[in-house]
Amino acid sequence: MALNKSQYFGSCKHTLFSCSGCNASSSRRNLLKGLGGISMLSAMGGIPAQLLAQNVTGLVDTHHHFYPPAYQKAWFDWEDQRKIPHFPQQERWTREGAIADMNKAGVQKAILSMASTPGVWFDLPLPKVVEMVRSVNDYGAEMVRDFKGRFGLFAALNMLDVPSTLKEIEYVFDVLKADGVGIQTNYGDKWPGHPDFAPIFEELNRRRALVYFHPLAASCCGRLNTGTFPAVIEVPHDTTRAVVNLLLSGTLAKFRDIRWLFSHAGGTIPMLAGRINFFHGNAKNAAMFAPNGVEAELRRLYYDTANATHPAPMAALLKLIPSTQVVYGSDYPYVAMDTQVTALSQLGLDVQVLQQIQQVNANRLLARN
């Protein structure tokens, strides 16, 4: 059974790189250039066991990507066919290298998740997608077992096929004992509040699951020529789209037992919260989607600090929500963990607030029910 993915990705021909519209190659090249000035991480192999806990201070990284071999090969093959350059830090990635970089940054535990681009589809028929998702989750669970206490897992879901997604939810929680699931902010032109996803969220709500969202640019907007690549503007904006869609669809209000975690300080939510409330807070059906008010709904969500350890976004975020709802995230390996840790520590936050963000909140969020 092959899905007609055009219904999910609009006119874009590249389901893999839906984050960058139909201009995946140039966007990827621009992104590589943009990342050139960022301190990238070296991936090391063959690290002695006695070094695996070196210089660890208890931080928990909730935004940490990984690359199972089969997945990595499928990704690179797809890029090679289209002459798209690989990310150097992704090419160098190893399990042992991730541990070494965690030790360097003082990160005790990292929660593994897939990046939204390319996701798990690769223009494959559904049975192959289901196989890819299973292999990714099995590999993540293997890392959790092999490096006890150092990794957790936000399991991947395909989302576009409800029956196989529900089956995978059962497997990752009951067999693999995953910490939660990781999903995209959109699937083509469907955001997470779409009715098609309701059965999935109903099951996740029944399990009181932790649901982590990673953004990608909408298929409509990857070719907008603003002089930069989609990761700079469109990616954080799509987190905002996802949050607003979940809010206005009533999904947040309906599924109260899901714990929701969003990347990059909620995208532009902290800056637009007042505007969202202004236009929707007094709607006739506001009690349906925001029973305690729009800002109250936004305050009960969780947000990570990935690419947001700058005074302006963190000040806006902490004005909107209590510090108990913020967790540290790095976006490794695209951004160095130690760089993010240092930037967070230099924001002048109260010591108690800093400790909450670095580890206390994440440990509470990840605690088993």
What are these regions, as identified by a protein language model?
Residues 210-213, 237-247, 252, 268-287:
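Conserved N-terminal glycine/acidic-rich loop preference
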Residues 58, 106-109, 147-153, 176-180, ...:
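Short, well-ordered coil/turn segments that N-cap beta-strands
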Residues 108-109, 114-246:
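Active-site gating/metal-coordination segments in enzymes
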Residues 2-47, 55-58, 62, 68-109, ...:
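Mid-to-C-terminal alpha-helical segments outside catalytic/metal-binding sites
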Residues 52-57, 94-106, 196-211, 250-253, ...:
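Short amphipathic alpha-helices and their capping/turn segments at secondary-structure boundaries
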Residues 63-65, 214, 264:
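Histidine-centered divalent metal-coordination motifs
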Residues 236-240, 251-257, 281-337:
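Active-site-adjacent C-terminal substructures of enzyme catalytic domains
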Residues 8-17, 68-93, 123-130, 218-239, ...:
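Active-site gating loops and adjacent loop-to-helix segments of metal-dependent hydrolytic enzymes
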